[in-house]
Amino acid sequence: MMQFVIAAPRSGSGKTTVTCALLAALKKRGMAPCAFKSGPDYIDPMFHRSVLGVESHNLDLYLSAKNTVRELYAHYAAGHGAVVCEGAMGFYDGQGLTTRASAWELADALDLPVLLVAQPKGASVTLAAEIQGLVHFKPESHIAGILLNDCSEKLFRMLKPLLETETSLPVL
């Protein structure tokens, strides 16, 4: 089963748009996707369900123990061909000034790879440095790939080799 977390360095990077686009593409390919949202957010799961017709649930590490979140994930993901978990806020941003209940903690608790949504507006090499910082901030970041959002095809062709060389991550 294909399963991963969609995360970003900060809010406003396009996580929900990317998540909805991926869910629609997976559904169109007949993969029967299931969606999750980290935290108590009810708006994004409503988009997943109402607009896309994709089953969606919340996974909240602030209100639930890790084992409970793992059990909920296993229960609701069962029988689906793909699972997309949408993170909230910035990748490491959790309760207060901690990583508790962050998208990173969810990826870590579920041992899922992370697709990092990055916006290259106004940056190139600096974007590589920022991503390197996210990858190395914790011993196990789970970041497995980069998706450039709000990026022209021309800029993508220029940034892809740079980012892949500097970060050792595939750029989608």
Label the predicted regions:
Residues 2-110, 118-142, 150-157:
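ATP-dependent carboxylate-amine ligase catalytic core
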Residues 168-172:
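Beta-strand-loop-alpha "switch" segments that mediate conformational coupling across diverse proteins
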